[in-house]
A protein has these predicted regions:
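Expand to "…catalyze enediolate/carbanion chemistry for C-C bond making/breaking, isomerization
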Residues: 1-194
Length: 194
């Protein structure tokens, strides 16, 4: 029997990277894995999971990663609760260019994602990725027809949901710049008056 980490690696190689009709489930997964830009973190206790998500989300760019996958097999959180937490955390992290996405065993699979692969373990995951890079890649995939076989519901639950965070992307940085510029102008103004 595989460990949870081995399940995730097998899922990536044997399922996510495999070509479907035209494209693999994630066209960028193999390159990121081969370039060691993917980190897998196994959290043993559910009550430590969200704290660990925050730690890893805060360190995404320090480690120059394309993807961090956190997983927990202690199934003491419901899919709705996990999704609510991740939605709230995205309001904190998307302005910092970091996007979080929850995945739960009970999530419905789209037809194009179905395959023979099965995990040995039951676990839920949170995937952490750079928001801007994900948006740019998604725009490219849109142009080449990648999403054409997706159902409207799945497209809305993934792509449109992520796009809904665009309005807050960069806001924290804009506010900081405005505050710094105000302080700089205020300081210069005081110096001129003296």
């Amino acid at each position: 029997m595989r460990t949870v980490e081995e399940d995730i690696k097998s899922w990536a190689i044997d399922h996510v990277e495999k070509h479907g009709d035209k494209f693999p489930i994630c066209p960028y997964a193999k390159k990121a894995r081969l370039e060691n830009q993917v980190k897998i973190v196994i959290v043993d206790k559910c009550d430590e999971f969200l704290e660990r998500v925050c730690e890893e989300a805060g360190g995404l760019f320090q480690n120059r990663l394309k993807l961090i996958i956190l997983a927990c097999s202690e199934m003491e959180i419901t899919p709705d609760t996990l999704n609510d937490y991740i939605h709230a955390l995205n309001h904190v992290y998307v302005p910092l260019n970091t996007y979080l996405m929850a995945s739960y065993p009970e999530d419905e699979q789209e037809e194009f994602m179905e395959g023979d692969w099965e995990p040995d373990n039951e676990f839920f995951m949170v995937l952490i990725q750079p928001f801007k890079e994900l948006e740019d890649a998604s725009a490219h995939l849109e142009k080449i027809g990648y999403y054409n076989n997706w159902s409207q519901e799945y497209y809305a639950d993934t792509v449109l949901k992520r796009q809904s965070y665009r309005r807050i992307y960069g806001k924290r940085n804009e506010k900081t710049c405005k505050e710094e510029n105000y302080e700089k102008r205020h300081k210069e103004s005081k110096q001129k008056d003296q």
